[in-house]
């Protein structure tokens, strides 16, 4: 788990990865524990910094077959009050209803969880860009 967290930190600050595109996968049910580590990008619509984090860091982990089954990467719009998903504890949430309990107030926020839903370290806030 520590190695995955270090990779996320490295990738977060690395300009080496770039790929464009839409949002990452939206979780439907996190209770099933599809991977030992779960990385979640909490984003807002039209957030340019969220797109940078998505492009420069998380899309690489999401697409790399070497991480399949080891790391799941998702994106949740924490202003969304319509789409719901099952959290690790079995309760249903929307991005908006989960933001409060997790203290997500800033976009982008990246959090890493183990398969049981325990946070693996402090959230990463913001982006590693000179203008940020």
Predicted regions and their residues:
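Sec-dependent signal peptide recognition
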Residues: 1-8
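N-terminal "domain-start" segment that seeds a small globular fold
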Residues: 10, 14-31
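Short active-site neighborhood of thiol/selenol oxidoreductases, capturing the structured segment around
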Residues: 33-47
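Hydrophobic beta-strand anchors of alpha/beta hydrolase catalytic cores
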Residues: 39-40, 73, 110
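Short pre-active-site segment immediately N-terminal to redox-active cysteine/selenocysteine motifs
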Residues: 43-47, 54, 106
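Typically the conserved alpha-helix immediately C-terminal to a functionally engaged Cys/Sec
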Residues: 51-66
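Thiol-based oxidoreductase modules, predominantly thioredoxin-like and allied folds used
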Residues: 66-93
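Non-catalytic, surface beta->alpha helical segment in thiol-disulfide oxidoreductase systems
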Residues: 100-101, 105-132
